[in-house]
């Protein structure tokens, strides 16, 4: 089977540095890379068209059956606090349409797989490219405007209806749809309406993330500048508005008086378009000596980081599933956060007392503090849940994806995904 994979977001683990203006690596990028490799190992031939950044080869063979092509039209380097660069995703779509025009003759796919994150441009890619290459498309909602997305700015709020309409359009014309959670699948099927049997749930996979020995993990974070002798409260991922970094800083301001826990150090592991804004907020709060910013780290460092944390904090505005939460818990670390989206299913099924209403910074501070002061109880609870987490978010993800592809390719042509007008 040949699959053309279209996604602005893809993890390039062949490099050790990642320019933040090209939208720093996050969970979606890592998950798509992981899925692509697992499918290639199962014999699915794939061509990935993604944004990339200067310094990457224009095209590379990641492994047999998996080619990754940097597909981006030229654009001025005007910084954006939401997408890294102004027009980055538009430049990707323009280049994709140009690159796909000859594919019908040179490398015709059996299926186009589009990965959408709640932004307009990937949603437009499916219907347009499907027509260009003469193949059906399936659509994965890594974040859904209809089910979980929260607008990130005033302009984003203004265009929210437009993008939600584009999501409906793309869903109705997809041969098959997948979501990360049953919650989103049910919501999307109800709102369109769409035959629920045509929406598959393909959650993120934890892959080979496992805990490392605690002394080794602590030594690693010390090498990043995290001091010894104090609890480590962590943030892992993209530094962006929707991840709630402002509330993380506000929590740190309240920590000494409101957490009930010893004085902590706050480790920010990752990068993103609002990194400098977060640094400025930390300095303005007088907390510069309590924060460590590691910047971008290769994903193979995640097990060491997650193992070394006393608690991972996720104050996200919206979170479709929360891959970082899964990785932390598999490594034995409790997670405190807001009860939004998929965190209600992942963290909520393990330590529900550590989830609090979105925006309640005081409650978030108390929850994170409880994870530190009552560490033995919470860690025992998390450890007991690991077998179930590995079962739900482990090796069978690739089997589900293969079945999803078989159903999409084998379905009789004509019409969309069984939608009712």
Curated annotation (Swiss-Prot):
Keywords associated with the record: Antibiotic biosynthesis, Glycosyltransferase, Transferase
Annotated Gene3D superfamilies: Glycogen Phosphorylase B (3.40.50.2000)
Domain of life: Bacteria
A Pfam family hit: Glyco_trans_4_4
Residues annotated as transmembrane: none
CDD domains: GT4_WavL-like
Documented EC number(s): 2.4.1.283
Biological process, per Gene Ontology: neomycin biosynthetic process
Pathway recorded for this protein: Antibiotic biosynthesis; neomycin biosynthesis
InterPro entries from the UniProt entry: Glyco_trans_1, Glyco_trans_4-like_N, Glycosyltransferase_grp1
Record keyword Transferase present: yes
This protein's record includes keyword Glycosyltransferase: yes
GO molecular function, one term: hexosyltransferase activity
Recorded catalytic activity of this chain's protein: 2-deoxystreptamine + UDP-N-acetyl-alpha-D-glucosamine = 2'-N-acetylparomamine + UDP + H(+)
Family classification: Belongs to the glycosyltransferase group 1 family. Glycosyltransferase 4 subfamily.
Function of the molecule: Glycosyltransferase involved in the biosynthesis of neomycin by mediating conversion of 2-deoxystreptamine (2-DOS) to 2'-N-acetylparomamine using UDP-alpha-D-glucosamine as sugar donor.
Protein's UniProt name: 2-deoxystreptamine N-acetyl-D-glucosaminyltransferase
Species for this entry: Streptomyces fradiae (Streptomyces roseoflavus)
